[in-house]
Amino acid sequence: MPSHLALLSCLLVLVLSLDKFLLPYLRKRWLSGGGVAAIIPRIPTSHFKSQRSMAAAAQWSETTMLVIDMQKDFVDPAMGSPLLVAGGEAVIPAVAEAVAVARKRGIFVVWVVREHDPSGRDVELFRRHLYSGGKGPTVKGLKGAELADGLFIKEGDYKLVKTRFSAFFATHLDSVLKTLGMKNLVIVGVQTPNCIRQTVYDAVALDYEKVMVLTDATAAARPDIHLASIRDMKTIGVETPTLEEWRR
């Protein structure tokens, strides 16, 4: 009992102290015109900005950008390739800008390219007739397989070779990304109804949390086909911002 009485005495002294010193101070601050803001200190907006920046940085560290098929045989008309994507050349600047933003944010950049045997034996059956004479599209070591002018693989980036439409088909891409803890994908390149679309559908099937296609950093042979493919991908939960919307 004596200990309980001592505790009660201490609490009583504390309450009286608050009444004598703190309450008059708060009353004075309130009456001075500051209201609640005068009593409760403002948290600097920089604090919230810092928290948002930290959250964004954490998200970017779990994000990969896939740059798909931005090779000369697909996007450079001067090559005369039978697989030229008519809208490909126009999006080269947007792809370059998207890659620059990704690198600045610390996003892992993967360059997905086709490189085929000169014989064409590793290409889809319906395209093998293009490889007579060992000079088919994107043959390994030939100029057509190079990245478009203005696009470069830099230290820290990753190059992935595929021989089919999807970047995930018969490659180790999913293994690499999951090992690195990647959860989100941002996709740019060509072309929308084929390699972009199949890669996206495989990514969704593989349970990547967020899959995003930058609509003006991707292209197809025709604008209507591009837009139709974008609409289809939106129906399965794929995000489709423009480059400007994504970079904000």
Predicted regions and their residues:
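Active-site-adjacent betaalpha module
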Residues: P2-T64, E97-R105, R128-R248
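A short alpha/beta connector and helix-capping loop motif
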Residues: S61, M79-A102, G106-R114
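N-terminal nucleotide-binding beta1-loop-alpha1 segment
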Residues: T64-M70
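Active-site loop/turn elements of alpha/beta-hydrolase fold enzymes
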Residues: M70, R114, D216
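Short acidic, Gly/Ser-rich segments with clustered Asp/Glu that frequently serve as metal-coordination loops
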Residues: Q71-P77
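Active-site loop signature of alpha/beta-hydrolase-fold enzymes
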Residues: D73, D117, A220
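Early exported N-terminus immediately downstream of N-terminal targeting peptides
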Residues: V109, V113-S132
